[in-house]
């Protein structure tokens, strides 16, 4: 990881992949979910490992979606998406180093599958 960067992981579903990574010794600096049920279920686990964990719903407007990521991330951060069921705006993809562990919202956008 780059000096001065942090690992930020996003998930929309259960967070089981992040939990598995943590159990194997990998520690994101910050985890964000837009799923309130998963937040409530996982917050004790992440707190035990001293990992910052935020529930942060995503706004509907594309303009606010770019702002959403900009308020969370710094230019040197490494971002991983783990079942993040949101399309990340192109501007955001260009600004940050993002790795998508799973395809996007393939239920509503099957053309993204692959």
Predicted feature locations:
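One-carbon transfer enzymes
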Residues: 1-114
